[in-house]
UniProtKB/Swiss-Prot annotation:
HAMAP family: Guanylate_kinase. GO terms for cellular component: cytosol. Gene3D superfamilies: Guanylate Kinase phosphate binding domain, P-loop containing nucleotide triphosphate hydrolases. Keywords: ATP-binding, Cytoplasm, Kinase, Nucleotide-binding, Transferase. One of its GO terms (molecular function) is guanylate kinase activity. This is Guanylate kinase.
Length: 218
């Protein structure tokens, strides 16, 4: 009993984390949105993918990507160590399972910056934990303009990215939520609202079953 005569509060356990998969065509803003989301939420971490591509200037192994060889990557595929993996522009990318599930079980939310195929694979592997959000650009013309202004790709690569953008966008209806990124602040606000709502879902709180049982026994 507590000092005021009421039963002592029942311990409320840690919630289960959310696997938040963000997808969009290249240049639609999902990377910037995910970084800002992380900066505003201390319990949110970014899933660090493994890749066979070479590090770009300023990238840190284990922070931006796990940079591994093709042989190492293929061995991990054989050992079923990835939630999902894909070959993009001749390079392999994959999402390691172990660190992700450790974070989720510890009550942290994990953000994934992945394509539609990766989002599908993640949802199939962890249907109760995964939440898929698609980020749409206001228009394809604006998307192409953003890619050109970045100055990172050749004209040929931009052309290929635009073709891939249409394919990516065609899968928008497979997602749980869709955000049109025509205003960054509003798009970020919507993303935070989605995360906060998903955190409240019953399945994220496994402690509730024991909590309710205890109430019923009073």
């Amino acid at each position: 009993m507590s000092s005021d005569g009421y039963p002592a509060p029942i311990f409320r356990g840690r919630r289960r984390g959310v696997l938040l998969a963000l997808s969009s065509p290249s240049g639609a803003g999902k990377t910037t949105l995910s970084k800002r989301l992380l900066s505003q939420n201390p319990d949110v971490v970014l899933s660090v993918s493994a890749t066979t591509r070479k590090p770009r200037p300023g990238e840190v192994d284990g922070q931006d990507y796990h940079f591994i060889s093709v042989d190492e990557f293929k061995k991990k595929i054989e050992d079923d160590e990835f939630f999902e993996w894909a070959e993009v522009f001749g390079r392999y990318y994959g999402t390691p399972k172990t660190p992700v599930m450790e974070a989720v079980e510890d009550g942290r939310d994990v953000v994934f910056d992945i394509d539609w195929q990766g989002a599908q694979a993640l949802a199939a592997a962890a249907p109760d934990d995964a939440v898929r959000v698609f980020i749409l650009p206001p228009s394809l013309a604006l998307l192409e303009d953003r890619l050109r202004k970045r100055g990172q790709d050749t004209t040929e690569i931009i052309k290929d990215r635009m073709a891939r953008a249409k394919d990516e966008i065609s899968h928008w209806h497979e997602y749980d939520y869709v955000i049109v990124n025509d205003d960054f602040a509003r798009a970020l606000e919507k993303l935070n609202e989605i995360l906060h709502a998903e955190r409240l879902k019953r399945l994220r709180h496994p402690w509730l079953e024991e909590f309710v049982d205890a109430i019923m026994e009073q």
